[in-house]
Amino acid sequence: MQQSESKQLVSLLDELRGAVEELLLAGLTTASKSTIERMDVSFKEASRMKLLRLGSTLRIANEEISRFTTGSTQFSSRRLAFFLGRAWLLATSMRGAVDANDTETLDRLMSTPPTQAVQSLKVVALGVAKRVVPGAFAAFDFRLRATEASSPVEAGEAMIWSCVFPMRKDLDLPAEAFLHLPQKQKFKPSLLLEKKIVEVTRCAIHRQSPSATRLVLGDASEMKTADEFDDWRPLWRWDPRAAAARLEQHRPTPLDLEIELQEEVFVDRWEAGERKSTDQGYDLLPISGGHLEFEARLDRGPSGTPLDAIMTRLAEKKRKPPLYGVVHYESCKLVLQPLTALGKDGPEYLTVSPDKISQAALVKAMKFT
């Protein structure tokens, strides 16, 4: 890390620790507006500096702060306390590693593996995860597959590309609308949902076991659609034994979260159990398939639109389509996040609404986002 980067990191860590301590000492009800704004700035700065672990922690903490300030019934004091504490612990540990010039520990805490350049890459999108906090942000994780080998990427390799959009409180716009806004590389993320081969040039990847390979774009990167893709079925497979082996070998640390160990799964034949409501802002839908028992969590807020309604409809069908999604392990349960229904004509993306987007609202978002 260069000296200028080290100074920026130290400044961010000190600012973050101070904001968390002020927030905990004053409490949310009496915390100053500037303290809450400092938390938001810290999240954006951590994302800009590609501090994956710290950025994701701050994102969730800010999500709970936003829920509290808006009076949302989904607010969880337990989640807020956990992620504020985790953010402080990460910031303190990283500052200690910087002071001790311990690059190995710092790299592990930053969770930023080295990148590898890729000149050209062809992918298709199997699904997309969506997380929305009104008045704060909308985040999308596109689950991709490489359609052919392109060193160092292997054919069929699982990949992720993520994008996060700030959301203003006064903007009445569905989260999907932001996918139609051009990125600084001049492409619109919505092209990934066209069920076509997408060609990405002058990009990079980084690998960090056991996560999927992450696609990284730079200022010179380009993304454009190519040919139609209809060879979906060979991509619809997973190996439970390999997943079990990865789980057996996994050694979590106190800083790891359950969702950091995820598996992409395909559930061919499945049945739904009795739906149950929780006070955590989501409903539980038991799903049995492939000799395994899953627990699907359906968000009752904007993150679950339109997934909640679609899964309710699919659960009532006699002939149910195969499902694709991601699973993490929590309290000895397989927690499923359904992303896609698999049909004869390819994937049906369950998490993004097909409704038309107001062009006038889009123009307004482009001016102020």
Predicted regions and their residues:
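Helix-loop junction hotspots and adjacent acidic micro-motifs that serve as functional foci
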Residues: 1-369
